[in-house]
């Protein structure tokens, strides 16, 4: 790490009130967590707390930790929300219990980490360890597995030599081995079997999404990265199955449900508007167009009744039909017959 910058700290966080939670290991750096609030948000995801983590306590005495500077390297803490601290035996036991089952060893336990690629496993003494190594700055080549014996893990120069032969970096020999967060390792005892690391040469560590792009999701433990769109596939299949069920009419109601290409909702029948109720007026009221009182101008005036000489004009369609006798009136006039016979042409004999 560059001089002057604060060193990274490894802490283990337990879940408040859960004695069976194995703990989650986190790497705390000033660059990754500039504030205490950012660190508490990461702790919430790491311990899978049902509510947001708002406080950290020491597991033995329950003293609150309010500043990142108060965190100690390889320290152990309990994450809690707004509830009170539950004093339980969070730290792992040493040795074996009376039932014969092995218990966790004292010290920072190796547990699942959201940024790591696998779950650390404690192997028997003398058993070889397996680690997965990425190439620094290479987002094309998948990680390779490296088997380290117990003797090789104790010599760090031997580990770097094996990495140089296996990795074959373009920059040359492997100078250091870093975690996915960029924290360089200096001894083989810091390696955890099953975890992912980055081999770095003479250049600087490149913080890239190695795990998200180069590791398939089935090989990752639960809670790690998943490729985008994988969660939506079952939903899409379920939606298609639901559509198929909707389009197929049920045998009980073959006439009511009809298949539709657009899966539209059935339209409701528009009910006709009811007729307006007939207005009923109280006695003495003519209607809405009739004035309740007589006007002052017409006070004392009498209504003129119609007589036989009153002429009225009726519409044509309402008049009574009349017979017009024009031919009879011409015959009754004197000299009309002679005029008619003179105007008629003479017929040939």
UniProtKB/Swiss-Prot annotation:
The keyword Kinase does not apply. Keywords: Repeat. SMART domains: DCX. InterPro entries: Doublecortin_dom (IPR003533), Doublecortin_dom_sf (IPR036572). It holds the Pfam family DCX. Residues 334-349 have a biased composition (Low complexity). This is Doublecortin domain-containing protein 2B. The lineage of its organism: Eukaryota, Metazoa, Chordata, Craniata, Vertebrata.
């Amino acid at each position: 790490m560059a001089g002057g910058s604060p060193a990274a700290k490894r802490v283990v966080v337990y879940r408040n009130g859960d004695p069976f939670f194995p703990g989650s290991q986190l790497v705390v750096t000033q660059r990754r967590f500039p504030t205490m609030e950012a660190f508490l948000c990461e702790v919430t995801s790491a311990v899978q707390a049902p509510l947001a983590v708002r406080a950290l306590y020491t597991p033995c005495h329950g003293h609150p930790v309010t500043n990142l500077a108060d965190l100690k390297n390889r320290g152990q803490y309990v994450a809690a929300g707004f509830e009170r601290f539950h004093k339980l035996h969070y730290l792992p036991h040493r040795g074996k219990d009376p039932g014969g089952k092995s218990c966790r060893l004292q010290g920072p336990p190796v547990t699942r980490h959201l940024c790591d690629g696998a779950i650390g496993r404690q192997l028997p003494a003398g058993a070889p360890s397996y680690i997965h190594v990425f190439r620094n700055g290479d987002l094309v080549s998948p990680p390779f597995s490296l088997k380290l014996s117990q003797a090789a893990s104790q010599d760090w120069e031997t580990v770097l030599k094996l990495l140089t032969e296996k990795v074959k970096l373009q920059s040359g020999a492997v100078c250091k081995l870093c975690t996915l967060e960029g924290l360089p390792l200096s001894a083989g005892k810091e390696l955890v079997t099953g975890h992912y690391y980055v081999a770095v040469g003479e250049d600087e560590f490149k913080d890239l999404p190695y795990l998200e792009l180069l590791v398939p999701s089935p090989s990752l433990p639960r809670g790690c990265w998943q490729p985008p769109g994988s969660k939506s596939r079952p939903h899409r299949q379920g939606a298609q199955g639901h559509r198929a069920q909707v389009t197929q009419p049920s045998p009980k109601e073959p006439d009511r449900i009809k298949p539709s290409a657009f899966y539209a909702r059935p339209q409701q029948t528009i009910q006709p508007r009811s007729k307006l109720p007939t207005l009923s007026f109280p006695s003495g009221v003519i209607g809405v167009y009739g004035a309740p009182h007589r006007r002052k101008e017409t006070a004392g005036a009498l209504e003129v009744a119609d007589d036989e000489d009153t002429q009225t004009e009726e519409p044509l369609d309402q008049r009574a039909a009349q017979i017009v006798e024009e031919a009879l009136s011409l015959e009754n006039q004197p000299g009309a017959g002679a005029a008619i016979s003179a105007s008629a042409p003479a017929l040939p004999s």
